[in-house]
């Protein structure tokens, strides 16, 4: 009654504050989240979120603690700390679950961290669950379904199940007329381009990535436009068109800026190294390959590290550093066979075998090339089995 007469809230009369502790905490978390997005160095914002998380847990405010954990997890993923990101995001979702429809970015980041850490099966399970959830909760939200269909196709491709990846994308393409927003089409075209590239169909891959780039050109989404140029360049390199690939690399580098994610930078540098090597620029090939490896910290991105080591091996071979090239080829083949796509590790074994043959190490070359042949034969057998089904 007194609060009403004075024109103030009961909380203010009791505490001297216009908002409750939970609201104040939520406001501070929102401020720290914004700082994370805008700041180049995020240490201070992360420290603030950790303090707020501790306060929230002490107060029994699980919603705020969850939000702080999720924000910290997203920051860890952006910094390439995938193991930490997985732990934080899983903990945040356990404290206070949020739906895939409400926070698709959280589930996308978690799945991406699983895949980057060499756990594609877990990523597939997550995205299958997300797709089922959004299909049930919002059957008319085709954009959300396309988002998680595309993520699922990525995870299936990483797992090596190209047939099922193709099936889920074909189903989405069949509903393409229902899409009204550009981003749904971009995601879908991107997924089809990536699948065709990995499946050894570069012409079809280029067709779809060009469609994605055309749509992204009319948006302000520079990050995804940069990634589209990187994928386009990678496809062009498979067709031995390094000059055209370099033009896409230059555009991507400008669009990424200085605050890019480690895997984006490493992938760009590795492909720039390969393009430079094919154009005979040894110094640039070495510099870019070394940058590709240096962009990744620890063992957070095993596949990307394998691709970086492969680029470094090619550059060292071109430079005449036989021992250094052999060491990098060995590391690349080990990482890519464990974490890469089959076409990648077949190709790295072939490249390594050709290098050993040029170096006069015929016995070692024969062993490596036999390994490449065996892996390629498995790939053909799998493809024939899928066709028979």
Descriptions of predicted regions:
Residues 37-51, 77-91, 118-130, 161-171, ...:
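Helix-turn-helix repeat elements of alpha-solenoid scaffolds
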């Amino acid at each position: 009654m007194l609060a009403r007469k004075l024109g103030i809230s009961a909380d203010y009369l009791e505490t001297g504050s216009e908002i409750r502790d939970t609201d104040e905490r939520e406001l501070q978390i929102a401020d720290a989240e914004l700082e994370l997005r805008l700041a180049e160095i995020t240490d201070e914002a992360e420290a603030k979120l950790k303090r707020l998380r501790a306060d929230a847990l002490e107060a029994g405010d699980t919603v705020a603690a969850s939000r702080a954990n999720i924000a910290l997890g997203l920051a860890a993923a952006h910094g390439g700390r995938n193991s930490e990101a997985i732990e934080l995001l899983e903990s945040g979702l356990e404290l206070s679950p949020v739906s895939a429809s409400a926070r698709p970015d959280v589930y996308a980041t978690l799945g991406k961290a699983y895949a980057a850490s060499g756990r594609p099966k877990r990523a597939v399970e997550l995205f299958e669950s997300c797709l089922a959830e959004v299909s049930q909760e919002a059957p008319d939200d085709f954009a959300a379904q396309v988002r998680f269909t595309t993520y699922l196709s990525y995870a299936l491709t990483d797992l090596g199940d190209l047939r099922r990846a193709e099936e889920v994308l074909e189903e989405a393409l069949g509903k393409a007329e229902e899409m009204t927003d550009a981003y749904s089409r971009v995601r879908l075209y991107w997924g089809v381009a990536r699948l065709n590239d990995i499946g050894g169909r570069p012409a079809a891959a280029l067709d779809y990535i060009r469609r994605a780039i055309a749509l992204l050109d009319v948006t302000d989404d520079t990050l995804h436009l940069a990634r589209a140029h990187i994928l386009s360049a990678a496809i062009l390199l498979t067709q031995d068109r390094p000059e055209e690939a370099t033009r896409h690399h230059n555009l991507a580098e400008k669009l990424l800026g200085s605050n890019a994610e480690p895997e984006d930078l490493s992938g760009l540098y590795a492909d720039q190294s390969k393009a430079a090597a094919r154009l005979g620029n040894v110094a640039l090939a070495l510099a870019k390959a070394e940058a590709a490896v240096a962009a990744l910290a620890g063992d957070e991105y095993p596949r990307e590290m394998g691709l970086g080591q492969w680029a470094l091996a090619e550059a060292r071979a071109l430079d005449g550093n036989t021992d250094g090239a052999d060491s990098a080829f060995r590391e690349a083949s080990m990482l890519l066979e464990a974490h890469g796509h089959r076409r990648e590790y077949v190709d790295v074994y072939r490249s390594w075998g050709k290098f050993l043959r040029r170096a006069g190490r015929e016995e070692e070359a024969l062993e490596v090339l036999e390994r490449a042949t065996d892996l390629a034969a498995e790939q053909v057998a799998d493809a024939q089995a899928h066709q028979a089904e």
